[in-house]
Amino acid sequence: MSLFQNVSFMTTNNPKIISEGLTYDDVLLVPHYSEVLPREVSTQSYFSRNIPLNVPIVSAAMDTVTESAMAIAIAREGGIGVLHKNMTIEEQALQVRKVKRAESGMIIDPVTLSLTSTVGDAKLCMKEHSIGGIPIVDDAGILKGIVTNRDLRFERDKNRPITQVMTGENLITAPEGISMKDAEKILESHKIEKLPVVNKDYKLVGLITFRDIANLQSKSVSNKDSIGRLRVAAALGVTLDAVERAEALVHAGVDAVVIDTAHGHTRGVVAVLKKVKERFPQLDVVVGNIATAEAAIYLAEAGADAVKVGIGPGSICTTRVVAGVGYPQLSAVMQVAAALKENNLQIPVIADGGIRYTGDIVKAIAAGADCVMLGSLLAGIKESPGETIIFEGRKFKSYRGMGSVEAMQHGSKDRYFQDVEDDIKKLVPEGIVGLSLIHI
């Protein structure tokens, strides 16, 4: 049987087969008279149905772009980062916790240690979670003390009981429900940096830090949730453990998940979408990637809270060359945005890929995108997790497509529907590895 038996051959007479498509380099915006001054422009938008943005910037779910450091930096500037999934479920959940604890009005679920812990346990815990203070509780969760990095600075004996170095007597605490203004007064009057919050039974319910209060005052543009924590999203794959991964991420405090595949207009993707939405109906689920109006309508009607548009436009993506599949990015964004509006399916559109210059961001938004996802533009900054390489006296960071062999070896095979293939020689890469000059 011929492979093309039921496929219409390409003819210039069929507009569905041959049509004009535009990418960012093909167009410019024509200026017109405006009553709005630049400083009066609002950059607020949406990442997904219920997740707002103060700037329409999202960092890509790539293992050389977004881990906790990048997600924290992006959220502080008003955007959101999508943590990549080339790590274990536990590691990805830990990355979420790092972002949620980076700054907040009050840490709802602070890291704690038991009374049987040692100095070594405390030092390891502080290093692992990038924190400077740990409440000490008993088996019932009753607050018994607090240990800070100042208490441990000159401690050489790792086996010394934590009860011998913690502050246990005359411990300063705050009652449950205290306002940030009153908490700040307590911190200032007692010259302390950590303030445990307890209920009427003296059970630990939270932790307020002076740094978090200072950040709340200095970074009004930061993208934060209802209790003052930085927002963060994380990627899922079309895998058997997708719901398990989503559950761990939700428990860690993730604000949204992204079902991240090279071809989102498939039965398998919608099956995962429905499973995740059934298990977590309040969780926003973004789905991608797609390139057509039909795909956007299909996913929106299936329950997606946003769609991610872009097949092959990225600088290190070779899908269009290897698979012969794709669509000019600007036209794809325009058609998806128009189709959702015409069908009264009001979910955000994320333009993913092909953004080489700042002007491309403007063009994408003008075409109908609610926000843009950046990869290469962020790969060369200090917050990106890529390996630093020195070449001819200049510093670079490695940057690779999630369809590269190197990335697929670390967990992204399912994104390109090759997760059943264990022989590296049989993998068909749809991405390359490159270097990005580190920006000073």
Predicted regions and their residues:
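Glycine-rich phosphate-binding active-site loops on the catalytic face of alpha/beta enzymes
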Residues: 82-88, 261-265, 309-323, 357, ...
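Conserved small/polar residues in nucleotide/adenosyl-binding loops
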Residues: 438-440
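Active-site-adjacent beta->alpha loops and helix N-cap segments on the catalytic face
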Residues: 89-95, 210-221, 243, 262-280, ...
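Short beta-strand/loop segments at the ligand-binding rim of alpha/beta enzyme cores
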Residues: 54-57, 106, 226-234, 278-291, ...
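Catalytic cores of alpha/beta
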Residues: 70-71, 244-245, 249, 292-305, ...
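An N-cap/entry alpha-helix motif that binds or orients negatively charged groups
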Residues: 2-57, 89-91, 109
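Bateman/CBS regulatory modules and CBS-like beta-alpha motifs in cytosolic regions of diverse proteins
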Residues: 39-53, 60-62, 91-129, 136-138, ...
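Glycine-rich beta-to-alpha transition loops that act as phosphate-gripper elements at the mouths
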Residues: 61-66, 113-117, 174-178, 235-240, ...
